[in-house]
Amino acid sequence: MSASSQMEYKDIPKRYIDPSAPKDVGEGSRVNGKDWKIKKDAFRVKTLGVKKLSTWEHREQKKLEQQQYKTRLQDLKQEKEDAKNQRISDLKRRREIKAEKERYEKMALKMHAKKVDRMRKREKRNKMLKER
């Protein structure tokens, strides 16, 4: 199937019909020297640039799309899970701070304020040493 086979005679460019028609400047002369011959298109459809995917290429394309879809879905799930874990850890940290504050307030009722401050500093020091 040539590109000009579907056209009407008047629509076909002259270079395909008339051998004496002037050539394009960039086209140059033929290698075999037969410049009087008519220019023709490729006979096979594959060489015209129209490409039909084979079943293997089609499967590979689908597999690639499916893989990209799965990775994107997994990334979204991971982001959601990370956000959830972050909220939980923030909540735990706030609860720990609140519990520690209440404990020091209870101690302050029983003891002198300076002694509570000393105990707080000592506990912070021990906590820092333990975390190392």
From Swiss-Prot:
GO terms for cellular component: nucleolus
Chain intervals with Basic and acidic residues compositional bias: 8-17
Swiss-Prot/TrEMBL keywords: Coiled coil, Nucleus, Ribosome biogenesis, rRNA processing
Subcellular location as annotated: Nucleus, Nucleolus
Pfam families: Cgr1
Coiled coil: 57-115
Keyword Nucleotide-binding included in the entry's annotation: no
GO biological process: rRNA processing
Signal peptide start-end: none
Region (Disordered): 1-32, 75-94, 113-132
Sequence ranges of Basic residues compositional bias: 113-125
Biological role stated in the UniProt entry: Involved in nucleolar integrity and required for processing of the pre-rRNA for the 60S ribosome subunit.
Family (UniProt): Belongs to the CGR1 family.
Name listed for the protein in its UniProt record: rRNA-processing protein CGR1
Upper classification of the organism: Eukaryota, Fungi, Dikarya, Ascomycota, Saccharomycotina
